[in-house]
Curated annotation (Swiss-Prot):
The keyword Nucleotide-binding applies. One of its GO terms (molecular function) is AMP binding. The gene is acsA. Gene3D superfamilies: 3.30.300.30, N-terminal domain of ligase-like. Pfam families: ACAS_N (PF16177), AMP-binding (PF00501), AMP-binding_C (PF13193). This is Acetyl-coenzyme A synthetase. One of its GO terms (biological process) is acetyl-CoA biosynthetic process from acetate. It comes from Mesorhizobium japonicum (strain LMG 29417 / CECT 9101 / MAFF 303099) (Mesorhizobium loti (strain MAFF 303099)). Belongs to the ATP-dependent AMP-binding enzyme family. Its EC number is 6.2.1.1. The lineage of its organism: Bacteria, Pseudomonadati, Pseudomonadota, Alphaproteobacteria, Hyphomicrobiales. It is an enzyme of class 6 (ligase). CoA binds at R190, G191, G192, K193, T312, N336, S524, R585. Acetylated. Deacetylation by the SIR2-homolog deacetylase activates the enzyme. Transmembrane segments: none annotated. ATP binds at G388, E389, P390, D412, T413, W414, W415, Q416, T417, D501, R516, R527.
Amino acid sequence: MSEVHVHRVQPAWKKNALIDNDTYLKWYADSIKNPDKFWGKHGKRIDWFKPFSKVKNTSFDGKVSIKWFEDGLTNVSYNCIDRHLKKRGDQTAIIWEGDNPYDDKKITYNELYERVCRLANVMKKHGVKKGDRVTIYMPMIPEAAYAMLACTRIGAIHSIVFGGFSPDALAGRIVDCESTFVITADEGLRGGKSIPLKENTDKAIDIAAKNFVMVKNVLVVRRTGGKVGWAPGRDLWYHDEVATVKAECKPEKMKAEDPLFILYTSGSTGKPKGVLHTTAGYLVYASMTHQYVFDYHDGDIYWCTADVGWVTGHSYIVYGPLANGATTLMFEGVPNYPSQSRFWEVIDKHKVNIFYTAPTALRALMGAGNDPVKKTSRKSLRVLGSVGEPINPEAWEWYFNVVGNGKVPIVDTWWQTETGGILITPLPGATDLKAGSATRPFFGVKPQLVDGEGKVLEGAADGNLCITDSWPGQMRTVYGDHDRFVQTYFSTYKGKYFTGDGCRRDADGYYWITGRVDDVINVSGHRMGTAEVESALVSHDKVSEAAVVGYPHDIKGQGIYSYVTLMKGEEPTEDLRKELIAHVRKEIGAIASPDKIQFAPGLPKTRSGKIMRRILRKIAEDDFSTLGDTSTLADPAVVDDLIANRQNKKG
């Protein structure tokens, strides 16, 4: 491996940092030695209606049970809004920056309180109760945050579906959690293009009805004023409804382990999993990681560029920052609209201090050269962050030297939908940085590397990343399917949470995430199960079989490479290729569009019928010199055809 460039903690980073290296080492040791005492103390960072007396009650064995602060009573929206009103009611809670650079607004904590209470009362008026599931399918507008917080105020469980997902994907998520109330907008706006959210919702509701889940009401925010279909009695205009209710709504007293939200994520088997997070442990962990990972100080302007449809938006646009009384920026647009300078212009316009984005955006912007960055000052920046996938050292150095002018620490954070918050990360005033490494575990997090047989690897090693004990932000179950939860995360290596990621630990104890080791690919920082894309392809009537693998992609990190076998008598044509791409977009959404489709007469299978994905990956990477033993294949000649017709030939 090439020489790793270490960036030592600069004196300026250390000067006002919340944590230095000695403090990190002490706190970390305490958190591992005595988790009850450590989290008992930090559990008090949120306000409780009834304090907890039990801290940790968790087991990774057998049935797997995870409970934190279980006898306490609290409320998330109270912690994100009410408790701040006395001290910072007139402070900006949310800065909203629209798709169009001239479109922005600021919402204070007082205004946030009123809007969330009104929306909570609208839901109550229409029969939404504690424990009911509410589906949110929204653009990046403040009402998306109001909807989340209003659910938490009345104890409803929200399930947010990313606005880029198709009607079919939305319907599947409505059906799985039997949601009867949906909040959406007429249209979304992204990069100057409108997205037909209400139209998609109408289609999804029809599909859900065929699966015996009847949506009673759809609350529609007017974003663009575009024309939409309307079902009187079912559909409600947001602006009409909030005008008819009171601006006060008492927060429900929620048990620490009451469900907070469900967020669907791709798995290595076809059906998306409803990751379930609960109330108190999640909020303690999201707010604590937000404070210490980003070295958040009172008054900082904080911007995470994610969408609330992903877990990063849940934890680090809404819940973490607002629980800490921060000013959080919500961005509706994309990095390159109307120009390649957009991110940096927004940073200057709103004097952003902490900026958190994804490697895929950075690689695309890096490709546009340094000029769009250099046009802006960015002098307000104090901390930079990266999330969603491992960041390659070249992109890291560009981020550090060009965006941060070599003066701003980068926190390269590793975590997952399932973990609720950041697990492995540098801390700005404490951790020497290495380009491409997530560095060290956060407090209370016990990483372990194991080999394929489950043998624990000590010291510098390369293996599968597991976590050996619970932390408060951990998911509790797969919604409606606890067996799947145990099977997916705790059966590969007994008594350990298996992350599904490969990882290398270097001689300094730093962790380097090497990517998924299961059948999940990471496209632009978003997880996509290969099985999901395969089932979408196979549902086309001309396709007999499909296999999907990831391959290295300059911008997205990983691209989607599909091998497709057609039904007898069907001809592989360019038109069919386009038709299949459109079909996948309809089934799942644009995010799952195959980058390459290779028509193949057959797939490499063992005699027992198992597809040899290892071989398909190598061919997709144009690296077939090390295909290994193909003698176990039922028909070794298939491989020659795949190599001859590969789509990624170099040179």
